[in-house]
Amino acid sequence: MFCRTVTMAAAAALATPSAAFAWGQTGHRVIGEIAQENISGKTLAEIELILGEEDLAEASTWADEERSNPDNFWQREAGPYHYVTVPEGQTYAEVGAPEEGDALSALARFTQIVRNPNASRQDKALALKFIVHIVGDVHQPLHAGNGDDRGGNDVKVRWFGDETNLHAVWDSRLIDSRSLFYTEYARWLIREIEPSDAIAWWTADPQVWVAESTQIRDTIYPTADQSNPNLGYAYQYEHLGTAEMRLKQGGIRLAAYLDQVFASN
């Protein structure tokens, strides 16, 4: 019933305009592209059976593109699937998922669908696209929110003079400052990944990813004595490298997770 609801909602959304993207379209697609280059041949074959010619970069933004769908699933149920909440000083293991679910509980749920031999190809495709998106989301530090400011959405800032919020800066403003198309950006970041980095980052444990995001999250807020600060070159210089590290890690972790998902198939 759940998968049928998602399928019907997706079909209804074909005529619905896209919502705002998390990590930005560029960020999600960079992560998908990096993963595509690092998955095993077996995993690639399994993905092609499900998605056909659609690659991971193209699939990565689907869950955001559907968020403007008026269907109840997208407006009520699926919203929490894009983030986790971990108050400062606590761990995800301590707080767990709320009753309405979150990114990690949804990740487990969709993983079960992809692994289910009785699930239809359509249901598996929807679940796989959610997996690709969620892994990217939880590598964005403000998608591991502290529970106080809606993941930085309530933290008003200016970005080179433009009114915005801290969440938007991390979703897109930082990485879009490179002015690169996602394929160019991904190729550049792939060249920067040392073999030792790929080995060190190769973990399919979502709680590790969340712990990293919460640790970074607590270092990226403007100083407390600033009201509506104007973030510019200094903030960009200090944090763009961290954002790009999370893109690289997100791509490697997505590959690791998908290899694990399809290992038993």
Language model region names:
Residues 21-134, 141-265:
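N-terminal, motif-rich segments that launch catalysis or mediate targeting to/interaction with membranes
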Residues 15-19:
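N-terminal signal peptide c-region/cleavage motif recognized by signal peptidases
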Residues 1-7:
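Bacterial N-terminal signal peptides that target proteins for export
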